[in-house]
Curated annotation (Swiss-Prot):
The family this protein is said to belong to: Belongs to the ZC3H14 family.
Zinc fingers typed C3H1-type, residue spans: 262-278, 283-300, 340-355, 371-386, 415-430, 437-452, 458-473
InterPro entries attached to this UniProt entry: Nab2/ZC3H14, Nab2/ZC3H14_N_sf, Nab2_N, Nab2_Znf4, Nab2p_Zf1, Znf-CCCH_2-like_3
Compartmental location: Nucleus; Cytoplasm
Quaternary structure note: Interacts with MLP1. Interacts with PUB1.
Keywords: Cytoplasm, Metal-binding, Methylation, Nucleus, Phosphoprotein, Repeat, RNA-binding, Zinc, Zinc-finger
Matches recorded under Pfam families: Nab2, Nab2-zf4, Nab2p_Zf1, zf-CCCH_2, zf-CCCH_2-like_3
Organism: Saccharomyces cerevisiae (strain ATCC 204508 / S288c)
Gene Ontology annotations of biological process type: negative regulation of nuclear-transcribed mRNA catabolic process, deadenylation-dependent decay; poly(A)+ mRNA export from nucleus; positive regulation of transcription by RNA polymerase III; regulation of mRNA stability; spliceosome-depend formation of circular RNA
Additional detail: Present with 9670 molecules/cell in log phase SD medium.
Protein name (Swiss-Prot/TrEMBL): Nuclear polyadenylated RNA-binding protein NAB2
Positions of modified residues (Omega-N-methylarginine): R209, R222
Biased composition (Polar residues): 510-525
Origin organism lineage: Eukaryota, Fungi, Dikarya, Ascomycota, Saccharomycotina
Record function comment: RNA-binding protein involved in RNA processing and transcription regulation. Acts as a regulator of mRNA stability: binds the poly(A) tail of mRNAs and pre-mRNAs, preventing their degradation by the exosome. Involved in the biogenesis of circular RNAs (circRNAs) which are produced by back-splicing circularization of pre-mRNAs. Involved in mRNA poly(A) tail length control and nuclear export. Functions in surveillance and the packaging leading to generation of export-competent mRNPs.
Amino acid sequence: MSQEQYTENLKVIVAEKLAGIPNFNEDIKYVAEYIVLLIVNGGTVESVVDELASLFDSVSRDTLANVVQTAFFALEALQQGESAENIVSKIRMMNAQSLGQSDIAQQQQQQQQQQQPDIAQQQPQQQPQQQPQQQPQQQPQQQPQQQPQQQPQQQPQLQPLQPQLGTQNAMQTDAPATPSPISAFSGVVNAAAPPQFAPVDNSQRFTQRGGGAVGKNRRGGRGGNRGGRNNNSTRFNPLAKALGMAGESNMNFTPTKKEGRCRLFPHCPLGRSCPHAHPTKVCNEYPNCPKPPGTCEFLHPNEDEELMKEMERTREEFQKRKADLLAAKRKPVQTGIVLCKFGALCSNPSCPFGHPTPANEDAKVIDLMWCDKNLTCDNPECRKAHSSLSKIKEVKPISQKKAAPPPVEKSLEQCKFGTHCTNKRCKYRHARSHIMCREGANCTRIDCLFGHPINEDCRFGVNCKNIYCLFRHPPGRVLPEKKGAAPNSNVPTNERPFALPENAIIENAPPQTSFTHQEQDTEMN
């Protein structure tokens, strides 16, 4: 709930409370808005009451203080999750009950005036408007003697508040009987939980400003009340009782001792805000503790061994989770997912890397984990990784491929550069052999590797001595003979003569003497 909602709800609650004030003729909405403005600006109960008392003389200071206290308690109830409708309904019930009990209160005041003739004679000149302020100071001293039988039904309600009442503030405004608040842990905790907070009253009394005698312990000092303030003065607030809260005159609260052990401890989800005690220390009165086993707000060593073991195990689990959390923050998560550098423009359907959600091409992948819906994800704010979008739709590539060049028209002419040509798209034939093709210029094979005549005149003309030259030469060119050529190299092989003429005399070979060495070996043996 935002601050504006708190303010609007508080205006409605304060206006409902002002509607219950008798003979209040001012604009209720305007006054409620002014009170809420004072509270929002940091005003306390005392400062707000002083401001209202200076503006509205027809309303008693106690009534204004009750309205301001109700506003503070309503604000705290709203912060604790109470609905504004519930608070308004309770205020309406209290207003209706207060109107019904107004006649009874007047009769009681008349009886009190009749039983106090001496006090009435001693103060004949007092104004009627000051009488409600002086009665709370005079009645506590004479109440045991003058009112022994009055209000027998309200004594059980006032008994729990008597230890907190001072000698000058013992008589309080009668409040309607309301049912006690139901604990959220009924049936779980043995003892009923008291109010969670105990108020600390640091403000002066509204009925007396600096007046009255100052006692021995009233001046500022060790053990006394500083500044003459009475810290024992309390004020009952019906709204606080109806909402299960402590009704006091200030909003400064300090935690008090909680009664009743929480049965959910050490696994209680409320933690420190639990209205019941969480035992963490050893009982000082053990083994003479009067409370039954399992109900004391502190630990008993021999009785709560299982609880101590459970507490230790819970503490170890908490420390382990804390250490794991710190380690996870320090160490980056290793998920094995690598983001695609092309992102939503990736045109590879089988790309193994991560891509943004298909519902938003401008999204970024922040969580390095795969999305469960993958390509069917419809969340435009999804921060997980997905497969390539080219699987479900056509993605235009970032750069289009260059068109292939048109095919080169081949020519049957011979390239004059031969094997030294550097043009990769040369359209002429290139000979790899210096031997002239047997077909010559009539060869039609585009991939022929033999030489072919070149339609260009040789620059050496008739004097060209290169027998493998493919250029055109004028008539009269004389080719040199090949070095080392046989004299009859131009004669066909079938006409070549044999090595010996036909009439040559062939002599027999001399006899062989290969056995002489064998004979010498036998003689030596």
